[in-house]
């Protein structure tokens, strides 16, 4: 098993866990009636399409603009959650992340945390943007937004690098779209 497949397996396992935890709140929120799609499912549908229409930098900038300063700590927590073993699961943060993933108009924080680990995080490492990937591992406030900003600065003016990242990440992004659709039903 390769490193990427282990990362992918862990991330997808964490995604399943997150989506499963939203099932109860989803049923309560809609009273069992009507059609409701989880926020993370909508974001998983939107992001690849935005990349193909506007490019990775524009799509990432738009998604980051939807993450408020108050949510940056939650984004940090989400990246840590998807990255590896969470020894001491912060129940409040977990509830916030699950709420973000489950609410129809939200999902930006949980989806960005997910893709910054895999597949975009892996594509960045493969493209030699290890400084950005390592920035995601730092502790401290707002480090994820800072690392994403670093990614955007690295992409400016280097269209070939952006296209390489798009091509490398797109298969994984499309898989996440399928997985969230299947789990969100």
Positions of the model-derived regions?
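Small/polar/charged residue-enriched interaction surfaces, especially the RNA/DNA-contacting tracks
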Residues: 1-185
């Amino acid at each position: 098993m390769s490193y990427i497949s282990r990362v992918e397996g862990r991330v997808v396992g964490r995604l399943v866990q997150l989506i499963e935890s939203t099932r109860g709140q989803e049923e309560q929120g809609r009273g069992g009636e009507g059609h409701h799609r989880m926020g993370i499912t909508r974001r998983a549908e939107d992001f690849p399409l935005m990349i193909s229409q506007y490019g990775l930098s524009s799509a990432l900038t738009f998604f980051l603009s939807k993450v408020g300063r108050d949510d940056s700590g939650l984004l940090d927590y989400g990246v840590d959650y998807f990255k590896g073993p969470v020894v001491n699961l912060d129940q409040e943060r977990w509830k916030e992340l699950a709420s973000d993933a489950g609410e129809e108009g939200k999902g930006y924080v949980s989806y960005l945390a997910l893709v910054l680990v895999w597949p975009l995080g892996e594509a960045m490492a493969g493209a030699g943007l290890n400084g950005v990937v390592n920035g995601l591992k730092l502790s401290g406030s707002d480090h994820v937004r800072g690392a994403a900003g670093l990614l955007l600065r690295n992409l400016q003016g280097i269209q070939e690098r952006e296209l390489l990242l798009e091509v490398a990440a797109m298969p994984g992004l499309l898989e996440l779209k399928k997985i969230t659709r299947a789990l969100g039903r």
